[in-house]
Amino acid sequence: MKIKYLLSAGALVALSATAQTLQTTQKGDTTIIKVENPTKYLILPIEEERPEAQLQLYSGKATDTWMDVRLAVGKTDYCVPFALTQGKEAVVKIVGLPKDAVALKEMKLSDTFDTTNTDYYRPVYHHTPLYGWMNDANGLTYKDGEYHLYFQYNPYGSKWGNMHWGHSVSRDLVHWDHLDPAIARDPMGHIFSGSTIVDTRNSAGFGKNAIIAYYTSHSMRNGKQVQVQCMAYSKDNGRTFIKYKGNPVVTPFDGLENFRDPKIFWYEPTKSWYMIVSADKNMRFYQSKNLKKWTYVSQWGEGFGACLLYTSDAADE
């Protein structure tokens, strides 16, 4: 079955000056959506109680990543934006969505997304994302007059999933500007919690004062958790991050499933960087001179811990 829509400038579903063509092809449980002259977003209708379908912005590259989205089948509870590649064509693949799903009829193209919130009980003083789901605060740092708040974030629903690092900045810790997600889920897995540093020494060679993020990549293989530590660096004051090609930088030497939440700090007496990782019932320490190659040092503690916050009187962060 093929469905073809011609969307012109000024139409409700397209705010671009160039006409967009949206073509949908379905075969079995797979839907292919081709958009010519794509707008910034494909607006996705969501139905909370439906099972997740798998959605992917397809380019044929190894970096293509599936997102789990509760696309509307019977009714639309709300909508979320899905960013499209800019150029002549964007291709979106969906697996697990019925042919008669409401989402296929109501999805729209747009260059904007209305983030106005009308929920009476929505917090005003405490930070919340414009839309989606959040929990752990990650990578809290200060640079050039800005406080950076990264956080666990699902931009495609109000439940846990598709872990990204969301990002907001503030100059007073009260008023926050919401930015695009800084680090997105990728083929290595969800982007779990971690920390950031400002590399004032240029230890990693990405440039003096580059912001470097360390996070846990989480995936499931053969029914077991796989958690490894990765790094990404930013040269534009934390707005966007480039994932290090040598990831992962730390893996559990004994195959632990619970191995996450890296915290990085500088220890002046040894003139080294240290990483502390929650390793099941212990905390493991790793040492590095260049922030890329890490050597296991020791472990400490008994009992389960996560999202560690460790400082030293000799630390210089």
Set out the residue ranges of the language-model regions.
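Short beta-strands within extracellular/lumenal beta-sheet-rich domains
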Residues: 24-36
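Conserved Ser/Thr-centered positions that define the repeating blades of beta-propeller domains
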Residues: 60, 170, 234-235, 285-291, ...
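Conserved small/polar residues in nucleotide/adenosyl-binding loops
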Residues: 310-317
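Bacterial Sec-dependent N-terminal signal peptides
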Residues: 1-21
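Entry beta-strands of beta-propeller and related beta-repeat scaffolds
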Residues: 146-149, 206-213, 271-274
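Surface loop/turn signatures of beta-propeller and other carbohydrate-active proteins
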Residues: 25-28, 63-82, 102-138, 157-160, ...
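Noncatalytic modules at the cell exterior or secretory-pathway interfaces
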Residues: 42-43, 84-96
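Beta-propeller domains
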Residues: 151-177
